[in-house]
Amino acid sequence: MTSTPTALSIAQDLLRCPSVTPADAGALDVLETLLKGAGFTVHRVTFSEPGTADIDNLYARIGNTSPHLCFAGHTDVVPPGDASAWTHGAFAGDVADGLLYGRGAVDMKGGIACAVAATLDYLAANGGQPKGSISFLITGDEEDVAVNGTVKLLQWAAERGEQFDHCIVGEPSNVETIGDTIKIGRRGSQSGVLIVDGVQGHVAYPHRAANPVPDIAKLITALNDEPLDHGSAQFQPSNLEFTSVDVGNPATNVIPAQARAKFNIRFNDHHTQETLKALVEHRLVAACGNRIRAHIEWLPSNADVFVTKPGAFTDLVGAAIAEVTRRTPELNTGGGTSDARFIAKYCQVVEFGLVGQTMHQIDERTPVSDLDKLTAIYRGVLERYFK
């Protein structure tokens, strides 16, 4: 039997493509060649949006029946930063002391490589066809604005009649070691700007002005005084975090006319975006009373909260993890947003990949042994899923 490529070799080929978002730099070509060679039907789809870069995406499928398991991910990466600070080139794909270095080694070219390697090995051992369908849904638009990637690729697939039963996103879900965490959900994210209007004037004549600075400080305190909630069965409490306060005033002798404070809320499944906004605005009105003039400008958001309830699918993935690592993974909903939020509208989805400790850092790296373990876990998922 001809041997299939290893996760390490695939990961190195991907890392050597400098696909800093929104550039593809040949990364999807690497995947297309491998998947076509294994019998997948591969589609390359480019999406556009005014004011954003055109993005190349890939959808590949083998099989045409249920059950249908999808592997999803992104080949774009964040910039490497100071190239001279890297021990090994950010796009060299070097291995040293058992570690694979490169931008995207963890987030998330390494995870994609493991999924592809596991799938090719599984197909080679099972007559080249699954007892159902396997697909890969890969975008080059996750690390930036995320408008021409997964969300549109899912819509495109649905219009073609594609139906997914379950999905694994290969994001670096583990905290410290392979097998410690499966992400089964993510909090929603909503940003806004609190704006307080005053009356500009000379500091020597405060009675002729209305200073918005003390008022915005009062409102920030008021909005943070009471928790938004106390958490839920699967989520930690929602959190409102102010991130900047600005008055745009370079002078020391002028009372500003307006003060603005930016904030972000990470919210759990007690809220929708609409009910969350209503709650915050209700508290703002109460804090303003009859004197302070303030309002909130809400920024657009496509980051809704989602959760995949523990059940047969999470048990299946957990069993594959336990077989390789002898660990029982924690089912977790912490962290930031990911493209899984879009996929959750189409099927049950979990995130499981490499260890995320060095993602987005100088010298991003992963142990080669972790690539081997993750490949074995994905292989175990496939065996169980199509049993």
Swiss-Prot record:
Record's catalysed reaction(s): N-succinyl-(2S,6S)-2,6-diaminopimelate + H2O = (2S,6S)-2,6-diaminopimelate + succinate
Binding residue positions for Zn(2+) 1: 74, 107, 171
Membrane-spanning intervals of the chain: none
Single GO MF descriptor: succinyl-diaminopimelate desuccinylase activity
UniProt cofactor note: Binds 2 Zn(2+) or Co(2+) ions per subunit.
Cofactors that this protein relies on: Zn(2+); Co(2+)
Alphabetical list of InterPro entries matching this protein: Bact_exopeptidase_dim_dom, DapE_proteobac, Peptidase_M20, Peptidase_M20_dimer, Peptidase_M20A
UniProt KW Metal-binding keyword: yes
This enzyme's EC code(s): 3.5.1.18
GO biological process terms, semicolon-separated: diaminopimelate biosynthetic process; L-arginine biosynthetic process; lysine biosynthetic process via diaminopimelate
Active site residues according to the UniProt entry: 76, 142
Disulfide bonds: none
Keywords attached to this entry: Amino-acid biosynthesis, Cobalt, Diaminopimelate biosynthesis, Hydrolase, Lysine biosynthesis, Metal-binding, Zinc
Hydrolase recorded as keyword: yes
Enzyme class, UniProt record, top EC level: hydrolase
Residues binding Zn(2+) 2, per UniProt: 107, 143, 360
Signal peptide: none
Family annotation (Pfam families): M20_dimer (PF07687), Peptidase_M20 (PF01546)
Similarity comment text for this entry: Belongs to the peptidase M20A family. DapE subfamily.
Free-text function comment from the UniProt entry: Catalyzes the hydrolysis of N-succinyl-L,L-diaminopimelic acid (SDAP), forming succinate and LL-2,6-diaminopimelate (DAP), an intermediate involved in the bacterial biosynthesis of lysine and meso-diaminopimelic acid, an essential component of bacterial cell walls.
UniProt-listed HAMAP family: DapE
PANTHER family to which the protein is assigned, alphabetical: ACETYLORNITHINE DEACETYLASE, N-ACETYL-L-CITRULLINE DEACETYLASE
Protein name: Succinyl-diaminopimelate desuccinylase
Species annotation: Rhodopseudomonas palustris (strain ATCC BAA-98 / CGA009)
Upper lineage: Bacteria, Pseudomonadati, Pseudomonadota, Alphaproteobacteria, Hyphomicrobiales
Gene: dapE
